[in-house]
C-alpha cells in the first residue's frame, strides 16, 4: 500500500524489510544507490533511486546509510563507496577501510567457490561467514536437469521463489543456475545470444541462458522474472527466441505479491 502498483516485487520486498527492521528497533539501515557497476553498465531506475524511494514512502524515523556506487563516474569507485558506508560512524581511515575490504572479498570469494561446487546457497553463505571453505559435491543422480534463470534475489529469497529449487529437487530435477558459472562462461553466454551487456546483473539472465542453451546436459529451462521489471522483460524476449532455435523447452514464470503455490 506504500508504493505504486507498478513497482516490482523485489523493491516491494525491500520496502517491507526496511519497515520490519524499524519495528525491531534498528536505527541505522543500509540503503545504497547502485547507479553503475562498470563503465556504461547501469542499474534499473528503481535501484538507482532506492534511497529516494524509501525516503518518500517510509515515514518512520531511522538513520539511512545511503552510499552511491557509480563506476561510470570518476572518483566513484569501490573505496569511495565503502567510505560513504562507514563515514556516518566516524570511520575515515582509508587503510582500515581497504583492509576490511580485502577481508570481505576473501569471504565473498570463498562463498562463490562453494556455490560453484554445487553447495546449497544458505549452507555456502553460513560456511563463508564462519571463515570456512569446503567443497561439496551432490552425488545424487537426477533424471532431469534444468537451468533456472533469474537473479539471486528472486531465486534465493524464499518468499519470492517459494523454495523453487527444493521443490524441483524433490521432483527429481537437478537445478543449475548462473551461480555455478564463471564470469568467462557468463560472458560467452551473453555473446551467444548476440547482444552486449547494458544492464547490471544482465549476465545472470542472458549470460546464464545463453550458456545453458548450448549445454547438452540441460534438458530445459525455467526463467523467473518479477512482474513490472522492464530490463528483464527485454532480456526474456531474446532468451525466448533463442530457446526455440536450440529446441530447448522453456517455462517463463512471472512473480508478484499475489503469487501463490
Please report, for each region that a protein language model flagged, where it lies by residue:
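An N-terminal assembly and electron-transfer interface module characteristic of large anaerobic redox
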Residues: 1-261
